[in-house]
């Protein structure tokens, strides 16, 4: 417990909030180039092969980003758009790749939640 004199001299320190996605440096999105595209397994109790990519951002920071949706066309040297957002069951993955932007194609045959996966509106006759 500080004394009144200590508070007069120094005051209370403001707690600064830590960013969930520090590599974006306050930007909503950053462009980057894939250096590695691979799959990894989630932590217990889940089981899958999650698609991830190591991405070197335009500010030269390298991050691990998740590739959402079923199937993708990304490979080494693909240029992608990265947004914040962690994947709860993949430790160290704090970013998502934006589907349908730059070299990342949208998810094929996606009917619901299309805007999150860069899928175009299907033709009226097709069901």
UniProtKB/Swiss-Prot annotation:
The gene is rpsL. The modification 3-methylthioaspartic acid is found at residue 89. GO terms for molecular function: rRNA binding; structural constituent of ribosome; tRNA binding. GO terms for biological process: translation. This is Small ribosomal subunit protein uS12. With S4 and S5 plays an important role in translational accuracy. The keyword Nucleotidyltransferase does not apply. One of its GO terms (cellular component) is small ribosomal subunit. Keywords: Methylation, Ribonucleoprotein, Ribosomal protein, RNA-binding, rRNA-binding, tRNA-binding. Part of the 30S ribosomal subunit. Contacts proteins S8 and S17. May interact with IF1 in the 30S initiation complex. NCBIfam families: rpsL_bact (TIGR00981). Gene3D superfamilies: Nucleic acid-binding proteins (2.40.50.140). Residues 1-25 are annotated as: Disordered.
